[in-house]
Amino acid sequence: MSNLISLTRDLIGDPSGAEQTFTDDQIERSLDVYRWDFRYFPLKPLPTVVSRNVEYRDWYSDELYWESDAALYDGSYGSLTPSSSDPIHGRWSFAAHQTAVLVSGKIYDPYGAAVDLLEMWAGKVALEYDVNADGAGLSRSQKRAALLELAAQYRKQQKIITAKQERADVW
């Protein structure tokens, strides 16, 4: 989860430290709103040619942003241990050929979480005020506008959710 929290912090421009706006727990709660659980989800192979034979050592998912605790299984549901993994990009590699790889774990939408956090942050800074004194001006309202503008940009990048609707009044 720490990689996803760091990624979300990077997206919203809130580095961890003494001056951070959000705690890791607040970011994790926002990520949990945009979480999907997968059980035995089939991965796709990337072929590798070894001595003129095709082997499947590298596997990937079309879904991105997996939590690092994702578990991998072979076609008979035996546990697998990858030689390398990149769960943020949904990629796992093995030292030996695998015929099928399934993954169980959670994916997140850091862009959706970033939008929520940016909108909360904009709500916080909306309470700040602009000051004009002796011809000099300090404008804090531009911070709110910038946060909302970034939120609107990320809203376009977040995961699309669709639902099937059935009408009971139409036969």
Model-derived features with residue positions:
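Conserved short "hinge" loops at termini or chain/domain junctions
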Residues: 1-110, 116, 120, 156-171
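Long, highly charged low-complexity segments enriched in Glu/Asp and Lys/Arg with interspersed Ser/Thr
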Residues: 141-162
